[in-house]
Amino acid sequence: MVYLQKQDKEVFDAIKLELGRQRANIELIASENFVSEQVMEAMGSVLTNKYAEGYPGKRYYGGCEFVDIVEDLARDRAKKLFGAEYANVQPHSGAQANMAVYHTVLEPGDTVLGMNLSHGGHLTHGSPVNFSGVLYNFVEYGVREDTKEIDYDIVREAALKHKPKMIVAGASAYPRKIDFAKFREIADEVGAYLMVDMAHIAGLVAAGLHQNPVPYADFTTTTTHKTLRGPRGGMILAKAEWEQKLNKSIFPGIQGGPLMHVIAAKAVAFGEALQPEFTAYCEQIIRNSKKLAETLQANDVAVLTGGSDNHLLLIDLKPLGLTGKAAEKVLDEVGITVNKNTIPFETESPFVTSGIRVGVAAVTTRGFDEVAIEKVGVLISEVLHNLENEEVLADVKARVATLTNEYPLYPSL
């Protein structure tokens, strides 16, 4: 960042501070990851200068022959990665990917069945404060109160009762595997479209460690970061028959020019995900997640559903008499970054919450194995049991520093 340091020291200094934070902290926010240097290099390339409204071979601007190569690479790699007939890599985010799918087959006021936000769904799955809940008539399904897991019989009952035009599967805070084949059966029974939002688990799906929704869903959306370990962005996968309508929904429907530098970074990340090393990485994610859940429970910290099948888990703080807001703040002060999160049948506000969500994708990228993640689980437990004990917190902070120093991040930057 030689030029930035010279021309705009204020921005440069802020970036350096953030790099320092990422290096010094144990990053456990489930939606975050650390991209490779080559992904960042593609994002910072001259492609940021190019406008390219339209699609490869059908642009509304001249001079697109080279960005066409990049977008074709991204699309082809995405299709190979997930076994899809069609891929659109232009969505700027997962939310816009979801919006485009809704825009393609729904009319305002249509009924859609989606997962309750506090039970693990997402804002774009029908929250009343989101465009999805404003434009469409979303009805909810959730998890069982006893197991905190999806009960497909209850989903089926809701579908039969409400006769939705679309069913949305997928979650942002659900630690167990989702049976997309079962969702397909339910959708077929009521004549509904099935959209799967696999944003959080896309990397695990690509690695063959979670059921692939693409063969079952009419539409599959995802972000390209999180477990997929690419740049911040979105993507849509579908059957080839939807190509024309979905393309029009993205452009000119809800977006203008695509971000070609981000699409280049997506192509690089997809290329990385096609390598055997990525599968090994995702296998380590699963091992780390299970070990973290096991360690927390062994130290009297409640983990919802008793464990995890993916990269994240939810901690129920009610038995400890804590709120997510308080726990997040103190954990951050000792160098452990998590996010407060609602839990099923929540009694606190979304800004306070009764839980925290933790994910291991980023620390696994950093090189943490089961031995390291067990140490993390012990550190979290000590903080949660000693939220106001300054001596304990100071000791934890020192041990966090020792641990992060053992796993250097971006040493070349």
Swiss-Prot record:
Reply yes or no: does the keyword Transferase apply. yes
Please list the residues that carry the modification N6-(pyridoxal phosphate)lysine. K226
Checking PANTHER family in the record gives: SERINE HYDROXYMETHYLTRANSFERASE, SERINE HYDROXYMETHYLTRANSFERASE 1
UniProt organism field: Listeria monocytogenes serotype 4a (strain HCC23)
Question: Which InterPro entries did the record assign?
Answer: PyrdxlP-dep_Trfase, PyrdxlP-dep_Trfase_major, PyrdxlP-dep_Trfase_small, Ser_HO-MeTrfase, Ser_HO-MeTrfase-like, Ser_HO-MeTrfase_PLP_BS, SHMT-like_dom
Its localization reads: Cytoplasm
| Alphabetical list of HAMAP family matching this protein | SHMT
| Enzyme class per UniProt | transferase
Q: What is this protein called?
A: Serine hydroxymethyltransferase
A biological process term (GO) from this entry: tetrahydrofolate interconversion
Q: Can you name one GO molecular function term for this protein? A: glycine hydroxymethyltransferase activity
